[in-house]
Amino acid sequence: MAGRGKAIGAGAAKKATSRSSKAGLQFPVGRIARFLKAGKYAERVGAGAPVYLAAVLEYLAAEVLELAGNAARDNKKTRIVPRHIQLAVRNDEELTKLLGGATIASGGVMPNIHQHLLPKKASSSKVSTVDDDDN
């Protein structure tokens, strides 16, 4: 039987690397795997499933945070608050479709004034006087 033998440095254990760092992700792959197993979504969970799910969740979070950061910058703020997340999600067509049924606490409502309630434009009378001068 061939064993490893007494190699130099055999006593030193190799530093453990997380599955998140192996996949190049910030979201915790191990925690997501644990939740998938405990949630009884299926009898067994493949090795790639939690990695893929972590990557998808990380991408969605980055997308929402980028748009919310832009909304905060537009409002001359340095801190993202729920209002900025609401504006970011509702102004993006795909995120609105994904999170359409979700309520964001303290998000407020989207600014909207019906066209019928807006004041009439006065520029139309000026155009008619210019036409009279040309004739």
Curated annotation (Swiss-Prot):
Principal localisation: nucleus
GO molecular function, one term: structural constituent of chromatin
BP-aspect Gene Ontology terms: heterochromatin formation
Gene3D superfamilies xrefs: Histone, subunit A
Compartments reported by the entry: Nucleus; Chromosome
Alphabetical UniProt keywords: Chromosome, DNA-binding, Nucleosome core, Nucleus
Tissues expressed in: Expressed preferentially in meristematic tissues of young seedlings, in stigma and ovary but not in pollen.
Highest taxon above the source species: Eukaryota
Matching InterPro entries: Histone-fold, Histone_H2A, Histone_H2A/H2B/H3, Histone_H2A_C, Histone_H2A_CS
Pfam families: Histone, Histone_H2A_C
GO CC entries: nucleosome; nucleus
Cross-referenced PANTHER family: HISTONE H2A
Subunit structure: The nucleosome is a histone octamer containing two molecules each of H2A, H2B, H3 and H4 assembled in one H3-H4 heterotetramer and two H2A-H2B heterodimers. The octamer wraps approximately 147 bp of DNA.
Family: Belongs to the histone H2A family.
Function field: Core component of nucleosome. Nucleosomes wrap and compact DNA into chromatin, limiting DNA accessibility to the cellular machineries which require DNA as a template. Histones thereby play a central role in transcription regulation, DNA repair, DNA replication and chromosomal stability. DNA accessibility is regulated via a complex set of post-translational modifications of histones, also called histone code, and nucleosome remodeling.
Protein name per Swiss-Prot or TrEMBL: Histone H2A.4
Species, as recorded: Triticum aestivum (Wheat)
Taxon lineage: Eukaryota, Viridiplantae, Streptophyta, Embryophyta, Tracheophyta
Gene behind the chain: TH254
